[in-house]
């Protein structure tokens, strides 16, 4: 799967506002040019429900990464930044992991990280991060709403996902939301 194919997959968005953390993901699964599932769950709660994680890319690869990430969280006692960095290191150095094609978006009450297929671990500058084919649309919409409205984090995530779903053909309107 090429990196171009990787991002043609979904939209996962994380929004922070007023101490609330909300992650949202659409439910569409696309195989080639067709939609094969409309209500997939692309979000998970990890480490005693203190961390939310979402994925874009290959579903099988994402499940493998969720398992590894959960192991890192256990190993580092829920320290999100340490677990993310260690998973990133493994992803860069392990020959089998380098073959996995997925992106992870992970958040706890204090931090958000994007973990890429190249092993990059990126903490966004703002309270907004998104991955997947509709990520740019969701980020733009959420940024505008965060800066120019009084909507709470959940409302911003819901509205931004609606906008992304109207623009991105790989994103639908069946949104799953998790909050911290």
Curated annotation (Swiss-Prot):
HAMAP family: HslV. Its EC number is 3.4.25.2. InterPro entries: ATP-dep_Prtase_HsIV_su (IPR022281), Ntn_hydrolases_N (IPR029055), Proteasome_sua/b (IPR001353), Proteasome_suB-type (IPR023333). It is found in: Cytoplasm. Belongs to the peptidase T1B family. HslV subfamily. It catalyses: ATP-dependent cleavage of peptide bonds with broad specificity. GO terms for cellular component: HslUV protease complex; proteasome core complex. One of its GO terms (molecular function) is metal ion binding. Keywords: Allosteric enzyme, Cytoplasm, Hydrolase, Metal-binding, Protease, Sodium, Threonine protease. This is ATP-dependent protease subunit HslV. It is an enzyme of class 3 (hydrolase). One of its GO terms (biological process) is proteolysis involved in protein catabolic process. The active site is at residue 10. NCBIfam families: ATP_dep_HslV, PRK05456.1. It comes from Koribacter versatilis (strain Ellin345). A double ring-shaped homohexamer of HslV is capped on each side by a ring-shaped HslU homohexamer. The assembly of the HslU/HslV complex is dependent on binding of ATP. Protease subunit of a proteasome-like degradation complex believed to be a general protein degrading machinery. Disulfide bonds: none annotated. Na(+) binds at residues 165, 168, 171.
């Amino acid at each position: 799967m090429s990196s171009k194919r990787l991002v043609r997959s979904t939209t996962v968005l994380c929004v922070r506002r007023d101490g609330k953390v909300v992650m949202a993901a659409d439910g569409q699964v696309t195989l080639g040019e067709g939609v094969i599932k409309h209500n997939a769950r692309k979000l998970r709660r990890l480490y005693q429900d203190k961390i939310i994680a979402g994925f874009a890319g290959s579903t099988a690869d994402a499940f493998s990464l969720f398992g590894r990430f959960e192991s890192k969280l256990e190993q580092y006692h829920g320290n999100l930044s340490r677990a993310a960095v260690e998973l990133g290191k493994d992803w860069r150095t392990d020959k089998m992991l380098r073959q996995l094609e997925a992106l992870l978006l992970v958040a706890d009450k204090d931090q958000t990280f994007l973990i890429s297929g190249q092993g990059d671990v990126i903490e966004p500058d703002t309270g907004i991060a998104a991955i997947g084919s509709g990520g740019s649309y969701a980020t733009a919409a959420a940024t505008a709403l965060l800066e120019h409205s009084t909507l709470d984090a959940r409302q911003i995530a819901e509205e931004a996902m609606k906008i992304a779903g109207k623009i991105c053909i790989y994103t639908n309107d069946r949104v799953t939301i998790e909050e911290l």
